[in-house]
């Protein structure tokens, strides 16, 4: 398929993902799940081994109220036809009030009920110089700091 049209900004996609955030923070698990595609190609990827391509597994959890994503300063979305994407630098809010800076990208497709998330990748940015040590720590239990330092 050759496309000659450029991607265009999409407030519909942006609003869909921001509504997904809102539903998560409100603890509305079923309603948030309604914005996730049931397409067999659906996959959600997170940090440290989170790779979910099973619909039942993805939808089985419940969202804790006041825990979830808060939009970053400039979420952006684009579309071309029935496919589009979204990127953001949101914060993950924890129920205890703490927060973590995240990065998120998502692919959405237009379905009968509207735009639905078919892929999302959410992760914590780790500086390159710390990445290898952290991966070793997670995989092998190696301390993040050398003994005696």
Residue ranges and their predicted role:
Residues 5, 12, 43, 47, ...:
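Surface-exposed, charged secondary-structure patches
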Residues 36, 90-92, 121-124:
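Short beta-strand segments enriched in hydrophobic/aromatic residues
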Residues 111, 119-149:
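Low-complexity, intrinsically disordered terminal/linker segments enriched in charged
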Residues 36, 44, 60, 128, ...:
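Outer-membrane beta-barrel domain signature
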Residues 1-38, 136-149:
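Short, low-complexity N-terminal intrinsically disordered segments enriched in polar/charged residues
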Residues 50, 98, 114-116:
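Residue-level signal for well-ordered, solvent-exposed loop/turn and beta-edge residues enriched
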């Amino acid at each position: 398929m050759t496309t000659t049209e450029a991607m265009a900004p999409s407030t519909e996609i942006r609003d869909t993902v921001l509504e997904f955030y809102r539903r998560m923070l409100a603890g509305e698990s079923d309603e948030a799940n309604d914005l996730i595609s049931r397409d067999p190609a659906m996959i959600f990827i997170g940090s440290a081994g989170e790779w979910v391509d099973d619909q039942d597994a993805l939808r089985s959890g419940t969202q804790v109220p006041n825990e979830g994503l808060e939009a970053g300063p400039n979420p952006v979305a684009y579309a071309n036809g029935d496919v589009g994407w979204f990127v953001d630098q949101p914060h993950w809010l924890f129920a205890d009030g703490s927060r973590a800076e995240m990065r998120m990208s998502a692919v959405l497709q237009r379905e009968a009920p509207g735009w639905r998330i078919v892929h999302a990748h959410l992760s914590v940015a780790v500086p390159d110089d710390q990445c290898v040590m952290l991966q070793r720590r997670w995989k092998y239990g190696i301390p993040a700091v050398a003994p005696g330092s």
